[in-house]
């Protein structure tokens, strides 16, 4: 069983390796960590860590598919202000579309619905990272968009 300091060292080393954007397989990550002195590491542990930290495979500058930790899709934490979870707000003639960090849409939609008609919100529908919000009678989508922008202190 690893001591907490060794676990923290493993996490730091793991994140540092992924920032290099040169590992195309989990096996390569295992080998690199073993070479760094983490001998009790295997592919299944790497797989769990990749999932836990939200790692994705993407193309690097050399157009190779590699694992990385995308900063814009960071996992929300207890200390994340809600405004940091809202990525984009747009509208058309009938609906306001709000894009959030993955997993944050239902939280943001619940907040919007709690404000209700007084703020111009008739209702909201949320998926994983997208919210559709429709204006209450007497409000335009542009007014609703502006109210939501002000609520989240955004300048999009």
Swiss-Prot record:
Lineage: superkingdom: Bacteria
Coiled coil: none
Location within or outside the cell: Cytoplasm
Gene Ontology CC: cytoplasm
Record-linked SUPFAM superfamilies: C-terminal domain of arginine repressor, Winged helix' DNA-binding domain
Gene Ontology MF, one: arginine binding
Associated pathway: Amino-acid biosynthesis; L-arginine biosynthesis [regulation]
GO BP of this protein: L-arginine biosynthetic process; protein complex oligomerization; regulation of arginine biosynthetic process
Pfam families: Arg_repressor, Arg_repressor_C
Keywords of this entry: Amino-acid biosynthesis, Arginine biosynthesis, Cytoplasm, DNA-binding, Repressor, Transcription, Transcription regulation
Main location: cytoplasm
PANTHER family according to UniProt: ARGININE REPRESSOR
Similarity section: Belongs to the ArgR family.
Main function: Regulates arginine biosynthesis genes.
UniProt protein name: Arginine repressor
Species annotation: Proteus mirabilis (strain HI4320)
Name of the gene: argR
């Amino acid at each position: 069983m690893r001591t907490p300091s060794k676990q923290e060292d493993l996490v730091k080393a793991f994140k540092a390796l992924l920032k290099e954007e040169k590992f195309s397989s989990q096996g390569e990550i295992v080998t690199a960590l073993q070479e760094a002195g983490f001998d009790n590491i295997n592919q299944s542990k790497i797989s769990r860590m990749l999932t836990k930290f939200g790692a994705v495979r993407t193309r690097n500058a050399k157009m190779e598919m590699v694992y990385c930790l995308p900063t814009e899709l960071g996992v929300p934490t207890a200390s994340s202000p809600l405004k940091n979870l809202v990525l984009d707000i747009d509208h058309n003639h009938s609906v306001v579309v709000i894009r959030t960090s993955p997993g944050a849409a239902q939280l943001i939609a619940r907040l919007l619905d709690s404000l209700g008609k007084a703020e111009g919100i008739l209702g909201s529908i949320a998926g994983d990272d997208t919210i559709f919000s429709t204006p209450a009678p007497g409000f335009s989508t542009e007014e609703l968009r502006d109210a939501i922008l002000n609520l989240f202190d955004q300048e999009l």
